Amino acid sequence: MIESVHIRNFKSIRDVTLPLRPLNVLIGTNGVGKTNFISFFELLKSIFQQRLGAYTMDHGGIDRLLYKGRKVSDHIFGFIDFANTNGFEFLVRPKQSGVGYISYTCDYFNKNQENNKAYDSWSKKLWDKNVDESSLITNNQWRASYLKNYLNSFTVYHFHDTSNTSPMRGYCQIGDNVFLRENGSNLAAFLYTLSQTDKRAFDLIEATVRSIAPYFKRFDLKPDRNLMGQISLEWLENDSDFYQNGYSFSDGTIRFIALATLLLQTNLPQIIIIDEPELGLHPAAINKFAAMVKRASLHSQLIISTQSSNLVNCFEPEDVIVVDRKEGQTVFDRLDSNSLSVWLDDYDYSLSEVWEKNLIGGQI
């Protein structure tokens, strides 16, 4: 689990240290910087996977990633405290070519296993210095193996593309089934594997989909006989034998199927990060999604960004982090029940009403 994250000079985030819990729901209106916080984990993953150069260029160059550009910021700094045992730190600087390079990466090891946040007293090891890409992923030292396990433990999921060209709707390779991909492109293959290896989870996913789409009877997943090694999201409708596939689902339903598959699998990812999962979901589906999130948070750490009033109402104040923009910077404030008691108890406001009335920030 991530204990805390320290970010400096990344997009709209000037300098923030944010402790995290098993469940973290970021709420805020458009433009405050929720997605920038989520994007930080994509940057971190790109460093680990030796894709920093590609990542910076895909996002318009390093100036687009630096807080107010290189005229104001000359580096991006990140530090992640994993489970109070390991810390990973990096510093990225700009090159004249417009990409970023790694000034250094290092890790800290809490060898005494004490609840000690004086990281300078932890054992420190330098991994990279003044390189274009990190070498950590190919390092076989015992200490690197622990760090790689942590850095490989999270994925940012975006199930936004539900268009007719969405990879969730069409064919995918049946062998692409080890884990659900971040855009759901192997949804059919992953579900098929669950149906063969984890029937209990597969049945639960079907039942959950049925609860928000009563016309849905069950999935009818099988390898295509004409397209060798391919599979698509075929399913059966109640009271009909008409052929249905992924193109027959509404945008909200296919997004919900991907979310249910992610959250109801038995072998959950250690850290699950989801950007705006509420898009296109009916209020009843949002409530179901929240229930799945709470269930998953008993076994995994979840970080979710949203601007849905219905979704935030499903959680306790301590689960919610209000994201706001002040003096040109993104700031974060975790709620607590005691400070909100006058609004929640005395005035009988819901959590979303407190937010919508701008009593806790997060509204521009």
Task: State the predicted function of each range.
Residues N86-D220:
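Electropositive, glycine-dotted interaction segments
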Residues M1-R14:
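N-terminal pre-Walker A segment at the start of P-loop NTPase domains
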Residues G28-G31, E276-L281, L311:
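ABC ATPase nucleotide-binding domain "signature" loop
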Residues M1, A290-I364:
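C-terminal lobe/lid and adjacent interdomain/linker elements of RecA-like ASCE P-loop ATPase modules
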